[in-house]
Every structure is written in structure tokens, then in C-alpha cells.
Amino acid sequence: MNSIISKLNDKRILIFGYGREGKSTENFIKKHVRYKSLDIFEGSILQIDEDKYDVIIKSPGIVMLDDNPKYTSQTELFLDEYHAKTIGVTGTKGKSTTSAMLANVLKGCGVKALLLGNIGKPCFDYIDDIDDDTWIVFELSCHQLLHINKAPHIAIFLNLFEEHLDYYKTLEKYFYAKSNIISHQSENDFCFVGENVPDIEHKSEMKIISSPERDYELNILGEHNKINAEFVFEVAKLFYKADDEIILKGIKEFKGLPHRLEYFAEIDKVRYYDDSISTIPEACINAVKSVENVGSVIVGGMDRGIDYDILADFIRDNENILFILCYETGLRISKMLGFEYEDNSIYPEEFGNIMSTTYVGSWEEIEDVSLPNNVMLTVNLDYAVRLAKQNTKPGMACILSPAAPSYGYFKNFEERGEYFKQLVEQKESD
């Protein structure tokens, strides 16, 4: 950690953002750094007097599309020091599952592996645990990758779909942020890239992963997870301690993560799955294809402006599955499916501030709603679960797979998933 400390010693430091990572940064600095001053700020970047500080360490949720040499991040500082012993994992979907599976497999192969990063473990919290034998499996978001100088020695870029367009505006800018995980590598590095990822100028040794080359036995649902397993297998083979049998055993034994197509209850002979991590149409479609006998799917959340044509077509093509639409994206998808309405004309107060009211209702009483027979439209998750309970037949499954972010309605996808579980498990009389 010496280079990190030397960059911060005798500096006037501002921590910009005080969530989980901001607090982690504060703890690290107070423990290890000889600083001139240390301030914490939560607010608009326009309110920062940059002349007062030598270094500004921002949280990943604060997106800056332009470079400013005073600004840095945990990720940038960490990779500057530990890039040579880091395996970075990015992609629109599957980052957490692949990272956790890889860490599990490496440990089974006798490698000392630390799982850090966007999975909810700030890297500064674990620096004291790193020694010469440690390998870091680092889940990396687009925000973390946007401003880095050095890339991980081994990079995984799983896939690319439309996401975070509320920040980046275009898919090209979003891809540029992600691509830094490879474009900043050197000739001695390795990268593994999904087949739908656009070309990236690179110096490292690259392998394209298009389909599973082995018949993986998994304890988690989804054909897409066999692709994730293929990435894990290929990376694990780089380690001299890893042989095929041990790698395959570790992949098979991996139990998955919460809120990722997680089966959690059977009530009145209906199986319930929490796929709250789903924030794009492709994830929702994969979820439905991965579960047997799907009776109902709850879709909707914050609208980031991504394209939902593929999901609208999927809903039309699956007439035997009930799709319960809610929140902003649910309303937008309903319009794509034929629901005619004037913006802000239906329950504008309740819809505009859903989480600050106890209102629970639906649009089903409106006459002449020209939606397909397999679609229901409602306001929020509370009523969506009620509709699912009323309309999902015994022997079938109900999936929460929103195809949209939780922000504006819940703190994060974890809170949304936990709330879904509570609604499912509570009795109607509660």
C-alpha cells in the first residue's frame, strides 16, 4: 500500500461522497495516512472549492465524464498499486456472479483469493489482508473504470448491453468507460471478452468467449451462467495450481448470490423467484427462459431511457405468461403494447411520488385499456404482488425480474428484493 500512502501523505484531501466507499476511504486515511487536512462532502460538484484541496477522492456513484487531475478514486489508487495481482471483472450483466464464482474456484484450487469491489466490498477495507501470495478478484462497474490509469493483469469483459444511459447518454460512451479494463493493459496481460463486446484496441493477449466449450454442471439457474462458468474456467486455467477436475468441482459447488434468480419460497403451490438484480430487458428474458413453468413475471422500475422493444416483443410472443407491469418502465412498456394514455393524466400525484405515499392501486378499472390479455398494469410492487398471488396458478412460478433499476423507489436492488420477499411471504390479511 506504500504508493497509495505516498500519494496522499501531506495532502489536503476531500472525500467526495460518503456512502459505503466514502466511509471506507475515511477509515483508511485516518489509519495509514499523514494528511494535512481531511474533509468530507456530499453535494453538488459545483459547490466544491477545488483550490482548497490537493486530492479529491470521489465515490463511484459520482460520474465525471471529463478528466480532472485533482480527482481520483479508490479504484484508481488501488489499481495503480495492485494491478499486477488483480483479476478485473466487468460487463453489463453477470459481474457479481462471475466474480464470486471465480473467487470460489480459485480458493478451491489453493489460490489465496480476495473478492472485492462493486460486489459491496470496498477495496481499501481489505488492503491489510493482501500479501505476496494474494490475488484480488475485483468486480468493476463502468463508473469505477471511467478514470483509471492502469488495468488489471487479467481482465474479463462479459458482455455489453444498453445500461446507465441516464449518465452516459449513448451506448458508445458507456462502452468507452467499460473498455478501459482492456485498453489500459500491457503486452504481458490477459483478457477474456464476450462475443457481443465491440472491438477494443488492446496490447494484451485476448480470447473471445462465445459459447461454453464444456457441459458445466451448475447449482444456479440459467443457460447464461454456463457462459459465465466458461470465463471462470479459462481464467482459472492460467493458474498453475488449477487442474480441470478441481475447477469444474468449484463451479458445480457454487451456490449463487441473493437476488440473482433466487428461489426462496413455495406458497400455495406457487414457486417464487427473486431476480431483483435484473435491470435490463435481456436479463428479464433470460430469467423467464431459465425457470420452468413460469406463470407470472413482475416487470418495472426506474426509466433510464434504454430500448425495451426486445422485451415488448417477448411479452407479445409469450401469451401463456402473465406480465405484471408497474412503475415508470411498466407504464412505458404498456404504451408500446397498445395502452393509450396521455402523459401525467393518470394518477399523476401517486405515480410521481410513489414511495412517499401508502397508495396502492391499479389502472385496471380504466375502460378501453387495449392491452394484450397476458398483461396487467399497476402502480407499484405492493399491488403487483397481490395481482401475482391472485392470478398465478398452482404448479407455476412467479418471478420478480424488473428489467429496470430500483432507484427512486428503493435504496438499491437488494432492498427491492427483500421487500418483494416480505410481500410474498405475508398473508393477505396482514
Model-flagged regions — what are they?
Residues 12-14, 52-55, 112-113, 186-191, ...:
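Short active-site oxyanion
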Residues 1-10, 45-48, 77-79, 262:
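A short, basic/flexible loop-to-alpha-helix module at the beginning of a structural domain
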